[in-house]
Amino acid sequence: VSLSKLLFLSKVLNFPVKDIVDIEKIEIPKRYLELKNKLIRSHTYGDEKRIGILEEMFDEIYENFYDRLPEEEQLLVEVLQVQLDVFSSRDVTYGLTLLEEYFHQILKKKKYSYNDLLIINLYFLCCAIGLEDKTYFEELSKKVLLYIDYSDNERIYLLERILIGILIQVKIEDYLIYTKVFREITESTNNFQHKPVIYAFEAKYYLKVEKDCKKTIFTLLFLPSINNESRNLLFNKENR
């Protein structure tokens, strides 16, 4: 079922789309899905050129698809837009309002939707740069560990991002709590992209907490392949 036909019927019959058909069965435009996936997996690293490319993707979505998307997809787009605004140091007033609107609902949940995880990731990001206080940081950090669905690759990818967001903010003494879960995820998915991140945080734990030079050196042996993101996460983090 095409989205345009459903919207037409909804208007003629004066019924919400969700009352006509199961929202999950709506045919989402392939081009939109392509743009969405790129936005979710893209990183700007503060580079203006990368930010510009992502902004062009958002422009295309808002011009061609947004008004015809299901509500859940519209929310997803809005959260991704806010995330880019935060990364690029733009006006985040709307973003903080959006976060406030949905965040307290999320705190009451025991299971998280994909959009919930996006908003949680946004919250941790805002905490990291001082846009949000950390009132719920510890509570949410622990709850996230209880929710890991290894069968859903898209959510697992988001959980990896969330774990990184937690690790760059928790006390060094707590690193292994989160790297243990991170290891389980990488082993279950066979996706070792973030393995250098795990080794980096563990090496810092062994050096600063256990003061075990042998363990530190052994762990650091795995770091020659560390990527720029991993290096920034570890060495730009304030020593505590």
Regions found by a protein language model. Give the residues of each.
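Hydrophobic micro-packing sites on short alpha-helices
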Residues: 3-13, 17-24
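Extended amphipathic alpha-helical coiled-coil/heptad-repeat regions
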Residues: 37-240
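Short intrinsically disordered, low-complexity coil segments enriched in acidic
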Residues: 1-9, 109, 240
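TPR-adjacent "capping" and linker segments in tetratricopeptide-repeat scaffold/adaptor proteins
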Residues: 21-34
